Structure formats: C-alpha cells, structure tokens
C-alpha cells in the first residue's frame, strides 16, 4: 500500500509540474500576445513557431529519454548511460544550431520566414536547449525527485513569462 501512495503522490507532483507550467503559459501569454500583436499575422508567427518546436523536439531528442530509462536500470552503468545520453544530445543540439546558422537562408525559406533570421536563430537556440535538457529532467524522474523536477519546470515558465513580457514591452 505504501508504494501505491508514493506512486499517487509522485504522479500528482509530476502532473502539476507539467500542467501548471502549460496553464500559466496559456493563461498569461495568450491574452498578452493578443494585446501586443495587433496584427493577427504576428501572433500567427508565435503559434507557428510553437508547432515547429513540437516536431523538432521529437526529432532532436530521437527517443533518447526512452533509451535512457531502459538502460539506466542497470545500476553499475547508470552514470555511463547518463553521460552518454547527455553528450549525445549536447552534440546533436550544437550541430542543430550550427546547421540552422550555416543554412539560415534555406531554413528561413522552408519555414516561410525570409528576412526574419533573428526569429529563426532564437527559435533554434530555444529548441536546442529544450532538447538538451530532456535527459537531466529524465534523471530527476529516475531519481524520484518530483518536487525538484516540478519546481524547476514551474520556475522555468515563470522566468520565461517575465522575460517575454519584459522583452516585448521594450
């Protein structure tokens, strides 16, 4: 019974660490964006970049979280599995940023953002960081640290909200 209680508690905390940031992001930024971006096309850029982000995160993490959980179960190799997965995502994230910067013109053309290279570069950096952090967050889940996991997720969104509001108001 103790394990069931622990599972329920951790599920609740991990769930809050996932749902609260998404709710905050939606509840705060959606009204803010609709006031800031008078032209609906400008708000459409934000929405479209989020759609690209979802697809690219799947590609850039290439199932590494699943592989991490599968192989980290062998206690003697846990540190090696973690470092290998982390280095792999670091290398692919850096290569992604380099690729985007080297081929910025064709990438912006494919995404229909010609002459908006800054959008593409910032976007690539955000996607690369998100992909890279997948394994540290998976490690927190593996180590049964739901409060730390959720706190970092929520703090991350709060910082994002503050920066977005601050930077778009300038």
What feature does the model see in each segment?
Residues 88-170:
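Hydrophobic transmembrane helix module of multi-pass membrane transport proteins
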Residues 15, 44-47, 86, 120, ...:
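Hydrophobic/aromatic positions within or immediately flanking transmembrane alpha-helices
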Residues 4-5, 34-43, 56-90, 108, ...:
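Transmembrane-helix boundary and interhelical linker motifs in polytopic inner-membrane proteins
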Residues 5-65, 93-101, 126, 157-161:
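Signature of the first transmembrane helix
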């Amino acid at each position: 019974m103790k394990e069931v209680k622990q599972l329920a508690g951790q599920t609740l905390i991990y769930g809050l660490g996932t749902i609260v940031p998404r709710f905050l992001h939606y509840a705060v930024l959606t009204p803010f964006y609709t006031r800031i971006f008078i032209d609906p096309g400008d708000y459409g850029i934000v929405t479209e970049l989020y759609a690209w982000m979802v697809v690219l995160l799947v590609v850039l993490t290439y199932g590494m979280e699943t592989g991490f959980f599968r192989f980290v179960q062998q206690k003697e190799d846990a540190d090696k599995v973690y470092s290998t997965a982390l280095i792999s995502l670091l290398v692919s994230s850096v290569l992604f940023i380099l690729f985007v910067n080297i081929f910025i013109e064709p990438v912006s053309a494919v995404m229909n953002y010609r002459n908006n290279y800054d959008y593409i570069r910032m976007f690539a950096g955000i996607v690369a960081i998100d992909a890279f952090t997948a394994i540290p967050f998976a490690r927190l889940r593996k180590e049964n640290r739901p409060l730390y996991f959720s706190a970092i997720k929520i703090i991350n969104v709060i910082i994002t909200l503050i920066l977005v509001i601050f930077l778009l108001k300038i």
